[in-house]
């Protein structure tokens, strides 16, 4: 789909120079002399190589038309992830590398979004919010601080994050997966 370069947003996938590129970040620039332009940091989906490209604001770019479907995570066997479609029960397998560093969040029956381009799987996403149990953390000492502060914690999947002082071992928390940060304590 053809669009103006001014409409590029992070997270979009572009067809550029014969390949597919994920837009990582953009910066609009209006120099004192000359026309405005967009500086885009992009990642080649196939190779993972970064590309920094400059587009004139009025240039035409091609956004890739992607299909996105939700699947249910079943199990992982080696480097292969087995997923099932929730309505027709069709099972597919994807390479674990498609999840990149987010594979640590995989849990039974988790909903995984699989993105395809021309019937070829290009990447997969875990949900933005995942519930996990705190396995280890330091105890809270009342009056320890007057400002909000965080302490390290180890979660059930082995991941280490910073959590607020009031979180105890065995508490269930929600983690925001895009930046691997504490979001909230689960209210039961």
From Swiss-Prot:
Keywords: Cytoplasm, Elongation factor, Protein biosynthesis. Pathway: Protein biosynthesis; polypeptide chain elongation. SUPFAM superfamilies: Nucleic acid-binding proteins, Translation proteins SH3-like domain. GO terms for cellular component: cytoplasm. One of its GO terms (biological process) is peptide biosynthetic process. It is found in: Cytoplasm. GO terms for molecular function: translation elongation factor activity. NCBIfam families: efp, PRK00529.1. Involved in peptide bond synthesis. Stimulates efficient translation and peptide-bond synthesis on native or reconstituted 70S ribosomes in vitro. Probably functions indirectly by altering the affinity of the ribosome for aminoacyl-tRNA, thus increasing their reactivity as acceptors for peptidyl transferase. Belongs to the elongation factor P family. This is Elongation factor P. The gene is efp.
């Amino acid at each position: 789909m053809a669009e103006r370069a001014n409409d590029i947003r992070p997270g979009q996938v572009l067809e550029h120079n014969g390949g597919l590129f994920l837009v990582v970040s953009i910066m609009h620039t209006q120099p004192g002399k000359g026309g405005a332009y967009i500086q885009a940091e992009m990642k080649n989906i196939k190779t993972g190589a970064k590309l920094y490209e400059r587009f004139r604001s009025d240039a035409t770019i091609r956004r890739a038309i992607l299909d996105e479907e939700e699947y249910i995570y079943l199990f992982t066997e080696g480097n292969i992830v087995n997923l099932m479609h929730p309505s027709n029960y069709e099972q597919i397998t994807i390479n674990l590398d498609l999840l990149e560093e987010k594979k640590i969040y995989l849990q039974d029956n988790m909903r995984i979004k699989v993105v395809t381009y021309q019937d070829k799987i290009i990447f997969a996403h875990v949900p933005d919010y995942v519930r996990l149990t705190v396995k280890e953390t330091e105890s809270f000492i009342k009056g320890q601080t007057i400002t909000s502060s965080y302490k390290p914690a180890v979660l059930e999947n082995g991941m280490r994050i910073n959590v607020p002082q009031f979180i105890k071992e065995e508490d269930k928390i929600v983690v925001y997966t895009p930046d691997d940060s504490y979001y909230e304590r689960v209210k039961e």
